Amino acid sequence: MTSKSTFVLGHRHLLGIEGLSAADITGLLDLSEEYVELNRQVDKKRTVLRGRTQVNLFFEASTRTQSSFELAGKRLGADVMNMSVSSSSIKKGETLVDTAMTLNAMHPDILVVRHHASGAVELLARKVDGSVINAGDGAHEHPTQALLDALTIRRNKGRIEGLVVAICGDVLHSRVARSNIILLNTMGARVRVVGPSTLLPPGIERMGVEVARDMREGLNGADIVMMLRLQRERMNGSFVPSTSEYFNYFGLDQKKLGYAKPDALVMHPGPMNRGVEIDTAVADGAQSLIREQVEMGVAVRMAVLEALARNLPNA
């Protein structure tokens, strides 16, 4: 299979959704559509990255994102290396900059990086010659998650512009929320964040979103309900009285889903905490797109890898 799309991303790295134009996003989504179809065929291989080296460098635990990037790279023909941080020099006191310079000396073409500190991926990108993809940095951004969410929405609703998207839960600690807000605003959606005051960033309205502090108001008229998990690993205090009380007020069950439009669809970036932010009946119900999001993730990451590879020397 040869891509029909001639889209070239005018960036060396993908560090965030911020800085991407609507045309950039549309180009990546259109290219992703080709990979959705390819991934449903028996032969899923392409040779776009043949001879290229992709290093996955994850400083935080990941199941979906890391395995998705690994599969994407291999299906495109790359030599993929997963670097284990638990056994790396980082654990022995090496700085991130030294790690970047060491890796750069091995001439990787693409680095896929997840790090617990906001801005760490951008710092690393300044020190390497290849392309860098942000697979999530602290509470800052997670660009490929926002892209796969956008692809999922577009395939099911036919558009993004004009839709009402309610992002519910722990917005304060969520890089997924930030990237989605930027992308959805860029593409003309109407974005609403929903959650208790303790889990909403101060001044979030400045990002161009509506704010609701209860689910009835927040889900009213929503086309898409995007749930977020409580990110306890980023919390250094008590943000909710208890998980059971949180579920009573902000967990998505069938009753609360009824506040949204009758044809509203449910999304979640995973991993889910069933019975905390989402009820099993909703997560596995007919309005759920959660499994489809995982499928779209591989296609989007293949598209991002190809788009960046087109900018590499001798591409």
UniProtKB/Swiss-Prot annotation:
Pfam families: OTCace, OTCace_N. GO terms for molecular function: amino acid binding; aspartate carbamoyltransferase activity. It catalyses: carbamoyl phosphate + L-aspartate = N-carbamoyl-L-aspartate + phosphate + H(+). The keyword Protease does not apply. Carbamoyl phosphate binds at residues 64-65, 114, 142, 145, 270-271. Keywords: Pyrimidine biosynthesis, Transferase. Pathway: Pyrimidine metabolism; UMP biosynthesis via de novo pathway; (S)-dihydroorotate from bicarbonate: step 2/3. L-aspartate binds at residues 92, 175, 229. InterPro entries: Asp/Orn_carbamoyltranf_P-bd, Asp/Orn_carbamoylTrfase, Asp/Orn_carbamoylTrfase_sf, Asp_carbamoyltransf, Asp_carbamoyltransf_Asp/Orn-bd. Belongs to the aspartate/ornithine carbamoyltransferase superfamily. ATCase family. Catalyzes the condensation of carbamoyl phosphate and aspartate to form carbamoyl aspartate and inorganic phosphate, the committed step in the de novo pyrimidine nucleotide biosynthesis pathway. Heterododecamer (2C3:3R2) of six catalytic PyrB chains organized as two trimers (C3), and six regulatory PyrI chains organized as three dimers (R2). This is Aspartate carbamoyltransferase catalytic subunit. It comes from Bradyrhizobium diazoefficiens (strain JCM 10833 / BCRC 13528 / IAM 13628 / NBRC 14792 / USDA 110).
